[in-house]
Amino acid sequence: MLDKNILLDNVRTLYNKVLLYRNQLDKPKNISLIASLYMINYNEQGFTNINIPSIGEVNNNFCGYAYKNIFGNYSLKINKKLEDADKVVIGLYLVGVLLTKNIDDYKQLDIVTYLKDKKDVNKDSNEYGNIYGMFVRDILFDDNNLLELLNKLEDEISNEKRRSWLI
């Protein structure tokens, strides 16, 4: 995998941005951003464990389905192959999806389109879990793809126009 220090530096940068945007929200309970954020634990020693909310705790079907498919169907693979830092990247990916567009317009997300193009998935598919499953299975374990995805995520999060629906 990637050098852990490089990976954590990238993740910390994204994490700090996510915290900043969360603090700017007036009505966080209206979106699933907070549900996504509390799966990420951070302390002075760095990233520790990931708390995974149950589907019932997630106030959005899109987000809940993504949790189910990443941490449910792929839990065995994650437990055996992923370090905490890698799981944080997955968490930040979900947060990035929620930050960048209205959930109803998810199909227009650059990252989702990128993943679908990468795996040649039907653009009109409603099988959200397949997208995230492919992310875990095929993209996360390729160093070049992971770096590319981190860069895309950082670009999306920093794009003020794409976050305008939150205001």
Tell me the role of every PLM-derived stretch.
Residues 1-167:
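Active-site hotspot residues in diverse enzymes, especially metal/ion-binding acidic/histidine motifs
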